[in-house]
Amino acid sequence: MVMAEDFLASALAAEASSRAPHDPDYPLFHVAPPVGRLNDPNGLIEVGGTYHAFFQYTPEHPRKLVYWGHATSRDLTRWDYHAPAILPDTHQDANGAYSGTAIEVGDHVELWYTGNYKDPETGEREATQCVVTSTDMEHFKKLVPPVIARQPEGYTAHFRDPQVWRDVDGSYRMLLGVQRENLTGAALLYRSSDLRTWECEGEMTFPDAGGAFDAFGYMWECPNLVRLVDEETGEARDVLIICPQGISPEREGFENVFPCIAIVGELVGTELRGADGSFEELDRGTEFYAPQVMARSASSDSGAPTLLFGWAGNAGEDDQPSIETGGWVHCFTAPRALTLRSGRVIARPYLPGLPLAPATLEGAPTDEAGARVAELAGSRSWRLAFDASYEGALSVRIGSDSGLSITLDEGRLTVDLSGTRYPHGGRRIVTLDAGEASRVEILHDRSITEIYLGDGSRVFTTRTFLQGEGAGVTLSGAASVTNVSAVRAD
């Protein structure tokens, strides 16, 4: 029998021999695995001014032993990594400690997750909802057996990714992604008075959606429910974030392996009222999945923004250059502050440890050599923002021979990755609403690039793996650029 100490020792040994910190593609201000593979953000919570980011973690990748990794930060920019918090060391999670969330309860924090077990002889899957507790966020105690031992009747064992929160009436609620026996996706709601005995309330329904979500893909993963205030109206709305597998809407976008969408309404009981069947993709880039909202604690600032992290990765796409160069793969997005604007989700980068400052352009975009951002010369990890007005297209060039092409004009964003080392490259075009290209913010952190347009109304995340040094940034084209600000992280 393998003991917990053996699982921990294996993970720590893999970390001790890691090449990742020496890899020039390893990010400086994005959460990335100390070694091996990272995927979904898990258990995000801020306690006492410290931000805790847990994550799906396979330190011995490609050996498929899934732990929860653990990183902390005081400023969301500099991250410290700790020993794995959840080990796959019991029957209930022998085939992986899968995704979940965190909640503060009195003097301790509970990490809720899905335990995955697959019978080695029959291949039959067991999915259970499990909990780990901690009073200091350094030592973690696992409860055995699992709290919810199986899925309700009418659903397959694709029953996972619990989000747990305290409702306004003092009870606790849980939201889970599920697959019905007819192989369609849904979200289930549970309720409890003590976090240990749960009653299934039923599926979340959409009475005003005209059946739009009744057979919407074959599985809903990573559901998150978050309440956001609309900047235009001051009205608070509930936003359901889901990753529906198996949908192919006949419209622009939805080009990744699986999408991530937001549905806006008002949760009353199990009904998301006012959701009319419309939905939006949260990120139009090549790499974005399994986002999670960060939970608050009693010590959290009530005026602090609602934060979201995403996984900058896709299912089944682990063939990134960093596997060869550093023995690691994937990372998080930067934290994003969420609001609504006229019923649409707005996401702005939130990096208090990397504040923008006024920057200088050397030359003008219309010059033959373009305009270089003086403060970012030689930098491979930076943040840049500016306003633009267009008479033609504006090109953003990172380094001189990076192979990455970002082109903006009044109605379109074009990102061409075909010249980079990114294996799932090619060219992606995003149609923009009027005025969205007038405000631009770009985060570039060695091998990940995030583009924010329209003050957060359009977001594009991609892994870039540039050619050559990929240092500094130059703006060129028929556009006027003003209000430039920047900061380097290296």
What kind of feature is each model-predicted range?
Residues 226:
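Catalytic nucleophile-His microenvironment captured as a short glycine-rich beta-strand/loop
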Residues 1-161, 166-215, 229-283, 301-303, ...:
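Beta-rich carbohydrate-recognition and catalytic domains
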Residues 216, 220:
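Active-site glycine- and acidic-residue-rich loops that bind
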Residues 11-17, 232-233, 258-490:
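Beta-rich accessory regions
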